[in-house]
Regions:
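Structured mid-to-C-terminal alpha-helical surface segments
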Residues: 1-193
Length: 193
């Protein structure tokens, strides 16, 4: 895989101006993904790596979007502002985050935060994504039932991981209870299966 990614690194550098290279493989293995870490050249003295999770079999429901690279932090002033990259639509991300939260094997509080942000700040309506979630679950051979219950069941685990996993990633982390309640209201309103 390392050698097959060389052309990708070159294409990313050409398209975005960002220099990447292989760092290490992830210790955990999966049947439907390949996970590894890339190192990148940047201005920060701390760890300059990013985790990459390539899903091997996935159904995209919404078309990719062409978006400008955002420079949200002063420290990232070496990111080019005049480049664009292809990304998942916000609807695709919200559908995936909802399904990730409902997956018993996944316990990432970032999924909860992202879903909260998408529904509270980006205007994403989960009810409009129910069909997309059904398609994705059918593709995975999983039933589309009990999504909200599965997420509610994980409250204690997500709460326990909230600060430790997210506090260093943002300047103003909202309170877990506020975020969880808002997502629960959104799920009830969406009336998901």
């Amino acid at each position: 895989m390392k050698t097959r990614l060389q052309p990708v690194y070159a294409a990313v550098r050409e398209a975005s101006g960002i220099v990447f290279g292989f760092d290490r493989e992830d210790r955990q293995k999966s049947d439907n993904s390949y996970t590894f870490y890339l190192r990148y050249v940047g201005p920060l003295p701390s760890s300059n790596d990013v985790k990459v999770d390539i899903t091997l079999r996935e159904q995209l429901v919404y078309p990719l979007q062409d978006r400008a690279i955002l420079r949200g932090y002063e420290e990232f002033n070496d990111l080019p502002e005049d480049r664009r990259i292809q990304v998942y639509s916000l609807e695709e991300i919200a559908a995936e985050k909802t399904l990730a939260l409902a997956d018993r094997a996944r316990n990432e509080p970032r999924d909860l935060y992202d879903l909260w942000h998408l529904t509270s700040h980006e205007g994403i309506e989960l009810g409009a994504l129910a069909g997309a979630m059904r398609m994705k679950l059918a593709f995975r051979g999983k039933p589309c039932v009990g999504l909200a219950d599965a997420i509610r069941y994980k409250e204690a685990r997500l709460r326990a991981l909230w600060l430790g996993r997210l506090n260093y990633q943002m300047t103003a982390l909202p309170e877990f209870d506020d975020v969880f309640r808002a997502v629960q209201r959104t799920l009830r309103k969406a009336d998901l299966p």
